Amino acid sequence: EAGEECDCGTPENPCCDAAT
């Protein structure tokens, strides 16, 4: 939910890490 608004295009994205 935290990474829904974030663009998970890069594995180094801190937002993507929180979305997993």
Swiss-Prot record:
UniProt-recorded Gene Ontology molecular function terms: toxin activity
This protein's record includes keyword Membrane: no
UniProt keyword annotations, A-Z: Cell adhesion impairing toxin, Disulfide bond, Hemostasis impairing toxin, Platelet aggregation inhibiting toxin, Secreted, Toxin
Subcellular location: Secreted
Tissue: Expressed by the venom gland.
GO CC, any one term: extracellular region
Highest taxon, organism lineage: Eukaryota
Disintegrin domain residues: 1-20
Disulfide bonds, paired cysteine numbers: 6-15, 8-16
Main location as per UniProt: secreted
UniProt family annotation: Belongs to the venom metalloproteinase (M12B) family. P-II subfamily. P-IIa sub-subfamily.
Function of the protein: Inhibits fibrinogen interaction with platelets. Acts by binding to alpha-IIb/beta-3 (ITGA2B/ITGB3) on the platelet surface and inhibits aggregation induced by ADP, thrombin, platelet-activating factor and collagen.
Miscellaneous field: The disintegrin belongs to the medium disintegrin subfamily.
Self-association and partners: Monomer.
Stated name of the protein: Disintegrin
